[in-house]
């Protein structure tokens, strides 16, 4: 029997502890009931100063075991905690583990699949969960309120006999695809990524669909124009709604970003909020 040298276990020439050692871009497909998901994962542990390297295969094994053993369903956002726990059980010389998961998720909706992006970022030591953020993003549609009011005024000037009617209905404006992302601190493990999707849908509706029949297309456009929004409106409304309906502690962070692919400009419009549930709950709307 060959006695292989454990090189990783040797003492390094330069004794400096390393904060993050591990694997990046591990890819896994996952089927959840009628849905499909494609996961890209990073997993890191710390390595003490007196150890040359980490056992990289243990990181891959930690990911494989959790994914192959679990049926997550609604709780797919908990996958980071499970992987960190598994890693800490295998890396006996490490004190903390960090896991990052990007998920391309296709959710069955009738005969169609709606596309979501999900995000999990977890950091855990042997005593506590230090970080567990879950997030979701998808593509929607926004209509510009500024251009709408400008065209309303122009139409009324050109057609004074119908100005009263014009003031009561949505008018012409430019619209664009918009990507909105909501991320929430879930160390309390009280919410799921689908709770975040529900918050987004209250403000932005469901993700855009490749297949739209004539009436569906008309309703989508009409809905966006009945409720035109700047990217600033989008992030404010989603942040406020998240704090209102999600049962997370006051200290939980809530981050919202919104980016519109502007149809009349060669640039994008962007807005971002980074605050806490407690700060948002202090607001009194008028």
From Swiss-Prot:
Keywords of this entry: Hydrolase, Iron, Metal-binding
Pathway(s) per entry: Cofactor biosynthesis; 5,6,7,8-tetrahydromethanopterin biosynthesis
Domain of life: Archaea
Pfam family, one: GCHY-1
GO molecular function: GTP cyclohydrolase I activity; GTP cyclohydrolase IV activity; iron ion binding
Cofactor: Fe(2+)
EC number, as in UniProt: 3.5.4.39
Record note on cofactor: Binds 1 Fe(2+) ion per subunit.
Listed InterPro entries: GTP_cyclohydrolase_FolE2/MptA, GTP_cyclohydrolase_MptA
Keyword Iron: yes
Protein family membership: Belongs to the GTP cyclohydrolase IV family.
HAMAP family, per the entry: GTP_cyclohydrol_A
Function: Converts GTP to 7,8-dihydro-D-neopterin 2',3'-cyclic phosphate, the first intermediate in the biosynthesis of coenzyme methanopterin.
PANTHER family associated with the record: GTP CYCLOHYDROLASE MPTA
Name by which UniProt lists this protein: GTP cyclohydrolase MptA
Organism: Thermoplasma acidophilum (strain ATCC 25905 / DSM 1728 / JCM 9062 / NBRC 15155 / AMRC-C165)
């Amino acid at each position: 029997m060959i006695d292989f040298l454990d090189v990783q276990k040797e003492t390094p020439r330069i004794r400096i502890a390393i904060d993050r050692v591990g694997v990046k871009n591990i890819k896994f497909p996952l089927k959840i009931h009628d849905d499909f998901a494609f996961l890209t994962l990073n997993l890191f542990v710390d390595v003490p100063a007196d150890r040359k390297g980490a056992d990289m295969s243990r990181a891959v094994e930690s990911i494989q075991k959790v994914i192959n053993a679990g049926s997550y369903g609604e709780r797919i956002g908990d996958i980071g905690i499970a992987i960190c726990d598994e890693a800490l059980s295998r890396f006996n010389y490490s004190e903390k583990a960090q896991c990052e998961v990007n998920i391309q998720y296709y959710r069955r909706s009738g005969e169609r699949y709606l596309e979501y992006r999900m995000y999990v970022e977890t950091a855990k030591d042997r005593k506590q969960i230090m970080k567990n953020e879950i997030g979701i993003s998808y593509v929607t549609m926004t209509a510009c309120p500024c251009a709408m009011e400008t065209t309303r005024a122009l139409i009324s000037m050109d057609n004074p006999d119908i100005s009263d009617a014009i003031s009561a209905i949505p008018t012409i404006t430019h619209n664009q695809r918009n990507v909105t992302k909501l991320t929430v601190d879930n160390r309390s493990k009280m919410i799921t990524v689908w709770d975040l999707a529900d918050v987004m849908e209250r403000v932005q509706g469901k993700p855009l669909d490749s297949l739209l029949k004539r009436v569906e297309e008309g309703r989508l456009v009409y809905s966006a124009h009945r409720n035109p929004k700047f990217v600033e409106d989008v992030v404010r409304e989603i942040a406020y709604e998240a704090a209102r309906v999600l049962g997370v502690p006051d200290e939980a962070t809530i981050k919202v970003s919104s980016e519109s692919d502007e149809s009349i400009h060669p640039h994008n419009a962007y807005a971002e909020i980074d605050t806490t549930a407690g700060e948002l709950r202090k607001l009194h709307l008028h």
